[in-house]
Amino acid sequence: MTAVSPPHPALTPEALAAIYAHARREHPNECCGIVYGPKGQPIAARAVACVNIQNELHAEDPVKHTRDATTAYNLGAGDLFKLGKSLRGEEPAKIVYHSHVDVERADGAYFSETDQAAAQMDGEPSYPVEYVVVDLRRDGVRGAAQFAWDPGARRYVEIGRYPG
């Protein structure tokens, strides 16, 4: 395991347990949520499960939203509003998380090209947060990886791992 270290926000054991429990509850769909932490500290302590609205989007317009929640996630407008509002407060959003479910590769905790595109606007991060991707299989959580923006590479890169 590669530990996450400052200045990057590390998940507390309680937040990680909450994320893993959320991922297991949502199987076979991808879960998604936001982790908040104290302003000015590299801690991500309060995991808040969000509703993955991808199935709704897919049902409304399957041409535009070709994937359903088994292979994609989408945070709703209300959750994004709360994320944005938190950035001005004492407990800002530090991490956005989601799961990859039963992927056909050895390690499902990766930041896909779709994830890269969704996390950026005009080649820059959409929000000043990092991302955690959970590798979820039928038999449980295998682990997670954390990704941060690398301005030199102009993309999110893996900075640490959490055990399953």
Please give the residue ranges for each predicted region.
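Conserved beta-strand-loop surface patch within small alpha/beta domains used
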Residues: 1-93, 102-164
